[in-house]
Amino acid sequence: MVNMKASMFLTFAGLVLLFVACYASESEKKEFPKEMLSSIFAVDNDFKQEERDCAGYMRECKEKLCCSGYVCSSRWKWCVLPAPWRR
């Protein structure tokens, strides 16, 4: 009974290590969170209201400056609300 528990534990631990190793090698190739969030917040051209001189909330701020009340996130390059920990 103890041998079966130990072998199941070792098998499970091996599978977890294999998963972590595969994920680490894939994450070097892809920036999954950034791609996923960009696709979630992507705006279709049909839904755009108007072009402005500044970028609003959750808009890309690479070329445009953010509107007043927003700051450009250094990590995601989107206009976000300023927060004490971002200053």
UniProtKB/Swiss-Prot annotation:
Single GO cellular component term: extracellular region
Tissue: Expressed by the venom gland.
Coiled-coil ranges per UniProt: none
Subcellular location, principal: secreted
Disulfide linkage: 54-67, 61-72, 66-79
One Pfam family, short name: Toxin_12
PROSITE patterns: HWTX_1
Signal peptide (from-to): 1-24
Prosegment residue ranges: 25-52
Subcellular location: Secreted
One Gene Ontology MF term: ion channel inhibitor activity
InterPro entries on file: Huwentoxin-1, Huwentoxin_CS1
Keywords carried by this UniProt record: Disulfide bond, Ion channel impairing toxin, Knottin, Secreted, Signal, Toxin
Entry similarity comment: Belongs to the neurotoxin 10 (Hwtx-1) family. 51 (Hntx-8) subfamily. Hntx-8 sub-subfamily.
Domain notes: The presence of a 'disulfide through disulfide knot' structurally defines this protein as a knottin.
Cited function: Ion channel inhibitor.
Name of protein: U3-theraphotoxin-Hhn1a 11
Organism field: Cyriopagopus hainanus
